[in-house]
Amino acid sequence: MKWIAPALAYLAVGLGILQFHSAWGALVGFHIVIIISLLIARPNIPLAVLLKNTKRKWIVLSILLCGSSGVALYLLWDTFGFPNDLPAQVKALGLTSSTWIPFIAYFALVNPWIEEYFWRGYLGSETKMLHVSDLVYSGFHALVMIGKVQTGSILFGLSMLVLAGWFWRQIAHENRGLLAPVLGHMMADFTILVAVYLNV
């Protein structure tokens, strides 16, 4: 079950984006699949680990480093080769003037808790080397990026996400908790989505 769960998460995102053309459907479906998988697996990881942190410096570093990702995306927007019809593509996914703000709020405030418990908690590892969970975490984002940026930008984005997964996994191990990764993930999600919102 442990490694079936990511496959089901990929399926949920793929169906939401590619079949039903719904950003909300992809995100909520992704979360439902993860939560059901965790309820079935019943990992011996207390939810309190999401609030655990032993060294404040990791929170600060995680927030600053990950928050800079959206700032960099905004400042370097033109270098990533976004198509001229990106606003239309985004609108076709159901993200309009009335739904963007709630989507950003839900994505930034809810998603990091679910993802960090799943990827760095349930599927995580204490190895300092790259782990398969880093790669699998990165990979599903390709389903969101395909058709919206050039191939080179997709590969760059996936590489950065592998590093982000590895980084969050390391600070989770150092802190014996997931609060620093959650807050960094939260800042990354928020700033990246705001950068997209401001450009479409």
Regions found by a protein language model. Name each.
Residues 1-56, 71, 190-200:
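N-terminal, membrane-interfacial amphipathic/helix-forming hydrophobic leader that caps
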Residues 3, 7, 11, 31, ...:
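Alpha-helical transmembrane spans of integral membrane proteins, capturing the lipid-embedded, hydrophobic core
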Residues 3, 10, 24, 58, ...:
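A residue-identity detector for tryptophan
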Residues 14-21, 75-83, 142-148:
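Juxtamembrane "helix-exit" motif on the non-cytosolic side of transmembrane helices
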Residues 22-23, 55, 96, 129, ...:
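Helix N-cap and loop-to-helix transition residues
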Residues 25-30, 87-94, 151-160:
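Non-cytosolic membrane-interface motifs at loop->transmembrane helix junctions
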Residues 46-111:
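Juxtamembrane helix-loop-helix connectors linking adjacent transmembrane helices
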Residues 101-200:
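Transmembrane helix-loop-helix hairpins at the membrane interface
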